[in-house]
Amino acid sequence: MSEISTSAAPTEIKVGRHLFRWEPPDIGYVSYGGDLDGEAAAALSAESRKFTLGKPRVFLLVNMARVGQISKEARSVSAAGSKDLSIVGIAVVGAPGHVRLVVGLVSRAVELMQRTQDSPTRFFATEAEGRQWIAQRRQALDGP
């Protein structure tokens, strides 16, 4: 179900209509294109962990503008897939209101699995706004 795209950078992975791209040094970009079931969520999580596991910190930039239905299994798998990752911020782009509620619940589960309260989730209309927030968050974490 997953494949490494031959037309993109070697750090770009497609799982069905969904995409994960590792953007060094610390951004995991995810774009959902349609319904997300447990099988796709598990494959996406397994592939993305190859890049994110062991990194000192990870920001997630998640494009949900084209997401469809998100199954209960997909929500559980997505939260579990964050275990042992050093996620320090999640920027969600283009999520409609009902999806924001689901994302909020998954984000809370991620925080509980990481046992950290310093992994904020923020919502943005555009990818540029999400990237700007990540840059500001990175600067705040790095200090003066």
Please describe what each predicted stretch is.
Residues 2-144:
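Amphipathic, Lys/Arg-enriched alpha-helical "gate/interface" segment within cytosolic domains
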